Amino acid sequence: MIRQDILQRFPDLFGTQHVNGRDIDVEETIAALTRELRPEIAAALTARRQVLRSPEPVRKRYAWPRWDETFADPVSGKAWTFRDIVQGLIDNFLGRESARRWRLNDEVPIPDDAHPLANPGLELTGPWHPLDMAFNALNSPAPMNMPDFEDASPPHFRPDGTPSHEPIGIFAAMQNAKEIFEGRWNERPYEVVKKGKTRSYRITTPPAKWPTRFGRPPGLHVLYDHVTVDGQPAPGLIAVVVLWVLNNYEALHRAGTGVYFYIPKMQTPQEALILEKLLARLEGMIGVPAGTFKIKVLYEEGIAGLWLPAIAWVLRRRLLGTNVGRWDYLGSMMEMWKDDPQGVFPDPQNIGMASPSMIAYQRYNALIMLLAGMKNGELTQGAPIGG
């Protein structure tokens, strides 16, 4: 199921990995999770397309959820209404005990190195292939880095001018991460010829001072032709998450850190539930409590704002915070309003984070994270990110 050239070039990434005292096969895990979640992913993507193609007026198409709309709870297996979820947020903020009350990260505490308040600051992202990009990321004084398997690591092509012998960046970056975390580059230089000159790179920062790493997988819509299950391309989200967990959990755990992800392009609670199932299944496979893998979510889709309380609720065992950003959010607003003859499209070149609409966006994000992140009168269970 792994394309032969990928398997031959990166054999370390596949086959049986020893994780938390268990032997787990990478390909079998990708296949099992793909078979389980592929129908749900297809349904979620169909729902996206139906919204975009809907003939309903924009204001109706993107209306707030009904109070009696129900959502599946991955924790209890019961259904909650949107009213229950929002009331539970309010009860939590007010410190009021009730059956509806809920908050973030109540089961597995947030590690200090992943906590958005204990370890705040600049969050950098970029590809981890070529290797010097990964070295530069780890030598950075920034507190957090996202090895990027989304925007910066295209799986289907090599950029113009790339020699034919160069590997597919996704898998090369994954191999680089595995080797670095296992200490294979601690005392070794990486030498590469650039513009006719040999350049040498080293990791100069001790591992204890490296930025916290949050792997950024692709969105639900991306398929990997290099990994197939039952003759069909596997979802990139599943492939990357499985490869990252099974190849890196041991080394990250030994280093005193953990498995963390930055999730892009999330739009609805339906999509959040797919992610929660994926992560919970993997936690069960390696024998750690549900909620051990922590995540941040990029709130970069305007439609996600309608569902933000429910998205946070579905992910409450592991969500550290939701991140606001400008470029993708404005693009999503254009997509939402494209069919409205009265629509006014934002100009990303001129609208900054201090514009009134963007201030409202940031305040709303902060409000939801404040309501969900409070415990004993303090914001300890999560926090808004960015803005």
Question: At which residue positions do the language-model features occur?
Answer:
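Glycine-rich loop at the start of a catalytic domain that most often binds anionic cofactors/ligands
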Residues: 58-82, 139-141, 158-177
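N-terminal active-site wall of soluble small-molecule enzyme domains
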Residues: 77, 84, 98-110, 116, ...
